[in-house]
């Protein structure tokens, strides 16, 4: 995502909690003359018009934004903070309030599309916040996305991402069961996928994960650990708003089984490992 911003002509300052990753980015793109590294989030944010963040969870997010050396302490008034972390709606709203007090705009903007989407500039960005700030950052976000949409007020981006993860959980489990059934039935599952992907069963998961599931390949993509983190956020939010998510809760436990099998870093499509 940072590379797409840089290659679109913007000046970029990068910070990573693993310094070697920031240095590797500098080594790869330093010859553009528009990139530098920072040693703290605060330093990275100093003088920036827009600050983008993307970390692991609520705790990490609070640390890099609100800590003594956090980004917010380095941001000038009228700067816009855009957070791409998949986090809770609660922390999105809390950050919005902190930013308002500091004279800074905040957009919660989780993404969908995985590593491939980020690398190819084809992410989907779902945003929550105020319209004026969103309109300013949308052209920047389009450098690494194919869609960037304002879903509502602060927190709406995170709530939309939760809907996304609920749908993925059910789709991947259904796809895994279908493939496992077909294999037990002695069908050529690659041929089956070619056929049914042209009908009503077609999905992104089928197109991009079906054949790797057949081939028992899972050493890529979106890790099971991260999916469980996301589903935990979903299930906690469902307890607050009264939504009933029986299938999502069940699939979350199936992912726990995959973790016990040693699949913490396997792609989410590894749900099929429980069935074969």
Locations of regions flagged by a protein language model:
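Hydrophobic residues within alpha-helices
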Residues: 1-5, 95, 140, 181
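NAD(P)+-binding Rossmann beta1-loop-alpha1 motif at the extreme N-terminus of oxidoreductases
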Residues: 1-53, 78, 84-85, 115
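Interdomain hinge/lid region at the active-site interface
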Residues: 154, 202-268, 275
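A short helix-to-beta-strand connector/capping loop
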Residues: 30-36, 102-104, 146, 243
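Short phosphate-binding/catalytic loops that engage adenosine nucleotides
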Residues: 10-11, 104, 187
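Rossmann-fold dinucleotide-binding core
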Residues: 55, 86-166
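Rossmann-fold NAD(P) dinucleotide-binding segment
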Residues: 41-105
């Amino acid at each position: 995502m940072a590379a797409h911003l840089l290659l679109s002509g913007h000046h970029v300052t990068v910070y990573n909690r693993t310094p070697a990753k920031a240095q590797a980015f500098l080594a790869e793109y330093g010859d553009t003359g528009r990139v530098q590294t920072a040693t703290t989030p605060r330093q990275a944010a100093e003088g920036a018009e827009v600050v983008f963040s993307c970390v692991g969870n609520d705790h990490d997010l609070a640390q890099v934004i609100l800590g003594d050396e956090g980004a917010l302490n380095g941001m000038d008034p009228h700067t816009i903070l855009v957070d791409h972390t998949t986090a809770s709606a609660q922390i999105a709203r809390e950050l919005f309030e902190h930013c308002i007090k500091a004279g800074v705009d905040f957009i919660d903007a989780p993404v969908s599309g995985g590593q491939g989407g980020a690398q190819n500039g084809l992410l989907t960005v779902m945003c929550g916040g105020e319209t004026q700030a969103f309109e300013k950052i949308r052209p920047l976000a389009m450098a690494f996305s194919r869609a960037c949409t304002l879903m509502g007020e602060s927190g709406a981006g995170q709530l939309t991402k939760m809907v996304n993860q609920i749908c993925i959980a059910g789709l991947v489990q259904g796809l895994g069961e279908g493939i496992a059934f077909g294999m037990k039935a002695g069908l050529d599952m690659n041929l089956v996928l070619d056929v049914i992907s042209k009908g009503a069963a077609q999905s992104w998961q089928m197109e991009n994960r079906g054949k790797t599931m057949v081939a028992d390949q899972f050493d890529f993509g979106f890790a099971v650990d991260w999916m469980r983190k996301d589903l935990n956020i979903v299930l906690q939010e469902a307890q607050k708003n009264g939504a009933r998510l029986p299938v999502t809760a069940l699939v979350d436990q199936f992912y726990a089984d995959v973790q016990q099998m040693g699949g913490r870093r396997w792609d989410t499509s590894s749900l099929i490992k429980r069935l074969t």
